[in-house]
Every structure is written in C-alpha cells, then in structure tokens.
Amino acid sequence: MLRIAILGRPNVGKSSLFNRMCKRSLAIVNSQEGTTRDRLYGEIRGWGIPVQVIDTGGVDKDSEDHFQKHIYKQALAGANEADILLLVIDIRCGITELDAEIAKQLLYLKKPLILVANKADTLKDEYRVHELYKIGISEIVTVSASHDKHIDKLIHKIKTLANVPEVVEEPREEMHEEEVPGMEFPETKEFLSDDEDEDTAFSQSSVADKPLKIALIGRPNVGKSSIINALLNEERCIIDNVPGTTRDNIDILYSHNDRSYLFIDTAGLRKMKSVKNSIEWISSSRTEKAIARADICLLVIDATHHLSSYDKRILSLISKQKKPHIILVNKWDLIEGVRMEHYIRDLRATDMYIGQSKILCISAATKRNLRQIFSSIDELHTTVSSKVPTPVVNKTLALALQKHHPQVINGRRLRVYYAIHKTATPFQFLLFINAKSLLTKHYECYLKNTLKSAFNLYGVPFDLEFKEKTKRTN
C-alpha cells in the first residue's frame, strides 16, 4: 500500500487538500486554526494499487496550546508511517519560519517530499513560486485546494515519485443486492401472494469481503478514543480529559482474527445550547452521519456517572436508524462494591431501549473485557446476517400462542397463520394473521419479546409486520 502524509502548520489548507484527493468530505474544513487534531485516513481509488492518504493536525511546536504536544506527536507518527510526504504551505504568506522548521525535520527523514504551495488562487500567487526554492525542497507544485486547481498536477507528481503506472479505470458494473434463498415449504404458498415469496423477501445488505464498519458513539470524555487505542495498542486518537478532544470522525482500519474492522471514532454529541461554534456543530452532525454509515454501533457510557438524558437520546438515534448496537460501560475499574450483573440489571431498568440492548462492562485503562468487544461484534453481525429458518420462527410463535392465548375481542380471537423472517436490514419478521383489529399492543409486545429472547436479538432493533390473510382456496 502507498501511504501519503499531508503535513504543515495550522490553517494552510491541509484538510481541504485531503478532501480533494479523496474526493469526499472526510475532514472538517474551517478557517479556525487547529481544526484537525488527530490523524485522519482516507483512500484514493483508481490508481491500480491501494493508496492511503493521512491528514495530520497543524504543527506549531512553540505554541502554548494544551493540545499541541499531542498534535505534534500525531503528525510525526503520520510522517514516519508514510511513503511520500506533502508539506503544505500558504503561498500568499511565503515561507514562514515555522514552514522552514517543519521542512528541515521532514528532509531529515529522507523520504520523497513535495512542497505543496496551496491557496494559489490567482496568477499573481503562482508567479511567487520562485521564492519557495530557498526552503530546500526540489519538488514544488502550486495548487488551490478550495478551487480544485492543479490537483491533477500534484497527483501526477506523486505517481511519478512513487513509480505508479498510469491506469485506465474500467467502468464498474453496477452492484445489486444478492437475494438469499429462503427455505421452501409447500404450505407457504397458502399465505404468500403470486408476486411475493420467501426467496425474494429475505435479503442481506452486507458484503462478506468488506470490513465491518463500527462506530463508537457517546458523550464527550467517556473514553471512546481510549478504547480504540487500547484495542489497537497504538495511540491513534488524541486523548485528554477535556471534553470534545476528538472533532473529526476518524476511520481506523484494523484486522483481528482474519476479519477486517473499520472503526469510526466520533466526536461526542453535545447539548445544542453548548454548541458554540460551527466546528462543534459539524462534529455533532457527523456523529449522526456515522450512525447512519455504521454496520454496528458501540455506545460508550461512563460507569462513574448516572445515565444522562443525552445517553438516552443517542441510543434513541441508534435504535430509530435500526442499527445493531452494543452498550459499552467504560471505566468499570473505578466501580467498587457493585456486582456487574446487578449493575447491568439496574441499567436495563432505566430505559426502554437499554432494556433491549447488549451490554458489556469494560475498562480501557486496565483492558478488562476488551477482547469481548470483538467476539460480541462478531456474534451480533452473525445474528443480523443470518436468516432465521421459517420452521423455527413458526414453532417459536406456536409455543408463545399456546403459553399465553390472545384475548377474545367481540367473540373472536387473534390467529397467527404463518410467519417468516422477512428482511435482515432492517431486521423484520412478517406475520400473517386473521385480523389486525384483534391484535392488541400488549400482545404485540409479548410476541416481540418472545422472538427477542428466542433468537438472542438483544442489541438488534427489529420490527414485526402484520398482514391480514385468509387461507387460499383452490
């Protein structure tokens, strides 16, 4: 894999260049200095080889900013792991003392280095290129990331230095979701219409060879980045005790037991009244987008604090988007005199959505139960990727109906003729009944809880669809 690191002092347009190269808005772009704090990873496609772009935070070694030592460490780590380095400057400012200091350190690494003179929006700006050679870097390209100007020249220069052959990307065939065959039972046709059958009803949206996208969601300062760093045994995300340290959604690809995981570390959701600037607002909205993008969500809460209304709000967002999820109760090492099973029992009683969730008590600091995260993710993914056999669904419901008979309404009783596991995304069962008017909310909840317990659907938001049907006569 070819790795390209983008480096430079604050506010020279590194994130704008990163987004142009990756052709998507991954990094938060704003005129405020220090917007990017962690290393961000993006992917370039169509080069014929895997290419990864690393966006680093703005380097300012002399700054008294509380985060600068962390940002500098992250930027240096990005430079060390990269094959090609891009030093970005603001051509309108010329070569500053800090630019020269950064260039000196990068030249010391003896790696291919390109000086990217950004914000060359006019011809007058481009004419200043001759002033830049005094920095000691022979490869110089002028660009305007915000106007998508000369990005192609920069790409060509990178390919030349990396000996990447030019390839013509063939048009990709449009992908369609594969239908997962259902099990055939002769009696099924009594309830399914001519344009409706089990084979076409059930489908999976997941693709086996793609990494599982795992979003870590939670309020600021609950330990999301600490969990990722503990899992990966590497400091990839800046950690501090000041709430809101992570602002960008950070994509981190990781392999464990021959399975790939793409962890999305998100900025913490905040109360809207505390969102004081556009950066915080963008970060909050990105958290919601990360939920939509994820295959599985990990909601991180703090064991030392009571469950807040915003923890419940986040869980509500996850559940409404029908995302499989696990609640990670972090900082369990700080809890004394409480049995774990009692804590989980009491936690389930605090909220409807939590009562339906899978819960793990962990500690990023001591690494307690961290490996259970992977096994729980795999178990949850297997559940939502597998079809529940139709005979099993029907036997489970038959036993439930036998155990608790539906109540009689106007001389009639609810009858469930047949049921199938209809779809995986969202997870849904289809039940054929005699009349919806005979289905009470209480009995619907009873059937749903029965299926949840029988098929271990804790952490899997699912629906029951009811369809009125009478047996077909020939």
Curated annotation (Swiss-Prot):
BP GO terms, sorted: ribosome biogenesis
Keyword Repeat listed: yes
Ranges of residues in domain KH-like: 386-470
Entry keyword annotation includes GTP-binding: yes
NCBIfam families from the UniProt entry: GTPase_EngA (TIGR03594), small_GTP (TIGR00231)
Quaternary assembly: Associates with the 50S ribosomal subunit.
The protein, known as: GTPase Der
Species the sequence originates in: Chlamydia abortus (strain DSM 27085 / S26/3) (Chlamydophila abortus)
Taxonomic classification: Bacteria, Pseudomonadati, Chlamydiota, Chlamydiia, Chlamydiales
Encoding gene (name): der
